Amino acid sequence: MASRLELHEKLVNILGTRYVYFQPPESIKMKYPAIVYERSDIPNKFANDNVYLQTIKYKVTVVDSDPDSEIVERMSKFKTARFEKHYVSDGLNHDTFTIYY
């Protein structure tokens, strides 16, 4: 199983800045554009009554004021990425993806 910190660095490379946040508390003041991600599931595959494969599922959200953000395109090309939805909140565009890592 790959580490979350490895995933974090890959997301930093996609974004091009360090504004990548893992489960940020509400008290943090984020800078944009940003990527926010959180763990959403840990599906297991079993064999002989043991877990033999475990891949963590993450919800990844690209947040940008630009509705045509190139970051969304780069995120969509991430291995295992699946686009979920787009919405606007507080004047910022949010594009959510599911990835397994």
Locations of regions flagged by a protein language model:
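Acidic-leaning, charged glycine-interspersed low-complexity segments
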Residues: 74-101
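Oligomerization/assembly interface segments of phage tail-like spikes and tubes
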Residues: 54-65, 93-101
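Small/polar-rich, solvent-exposed N-terminal microdomains that initiate assembly or binding
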Residues: 1-42, 50
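Short, conserved charged micro-motifs
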Residues: 67-73
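A generic structural micro-feature
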Residues: 29, 50-55, 89-93
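Signature of extracytoplasmic/envelope-associated structural regions
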Residues: 20-21, 69, 96
